[in-house]
Structures are given as structure tokens and as C-alpha cells.
Amino acid sequence: MLILTRRVGETLMIGDEVSVTVLGVKGNQVRIGVDAPKDIAVHREEIYQRIQHERTIQSQMQHLEQGSFAPSFDDEDYFNR
């Protein structure tokens, strides 16, 4: 993990197209602005995790509807816990 120190108003670049600017600091909260192309999704981590979880459930539901769902786990790993 890269650790950077920035002050209010300072920006960091991610690649050529994404910039992250520190807009303010109040107590233990940091307000940032992200400027990215529309084709790059930007989410808070908890929202991203929820989206991934919902996609997994949706995929499993599609497999159930198609009758091709089978639980997947490695027998050896499961029984060697």
C-alpha cells in the first residue's frame, strides 16, 4: 500500500485520468473529491462490497433458475479444517 500525505487543496493522480483532491479535514473525517471518466466506477468500499455481494447472489439465482447450481467447495480443504 502506498501511503501519501496531502494537505487540503492538494491532489494526487492515479494513472493519467483519475485525480483525487483533499477538500477538507474535520475531526477524524477527510472530505475528498474524485475526478474520473464516466467509464470508471468510483464507490465507497462498503457500497462496492454490497454491489459485489448482490452480483454474487444474482449469479447464483440465475444458476438455480437454469437448474445448474451445485455447491462449490474443495472436499479436501473442507474436511481438513
Swiss-Prot record:
PANTHER family: CARBON STORAGE REGULATOR. GO terms for cellular component: cytosol. GO terms for biological process: mRNA catabolic process; negative regulation of translational initiation; positive regulation of translational initiation; regulation of carbohydrate metabolic process. Its main location: cytoplasm. InterPro entries: CsrA, CsrA_sf. A key translational regulator that binds mRNA to regulate translation initiation and/or mRNA stability. Mediates global changes in gene expression, shifting from rapid growth to stress survival by linking envelope stress, the stringent response and the catabolite repression systems. Usually binds in the 5'-UTR; binding at or near the Shine-Dalgarno sequence prevents ribosome-binding, repressing translation, binding elsewhere in the 5'-UTR can activate translation and/or stabilize the mRNA. Its function is antagonized by small RNA(s). Residues 60-81 are annotated as: Disordered. Belongs to the CsrA/RsmA family. This is Translational regulator CsrA. One of its GO terms (molecular function) is mRNA 5'-UTR binding. Homodimer; the beta-strands of each monomer intercalate to form a hydrophobic core, while the alpha-helices form wings that extend away from the core. Keywords: Activator, Cytoplasm, Repressor, RNA-binding, Translation regulation. The keyword Zinc does not apply. The keyword RNA-binding applies. It comes from the Bacteria. It is found in: Cytoplasm.
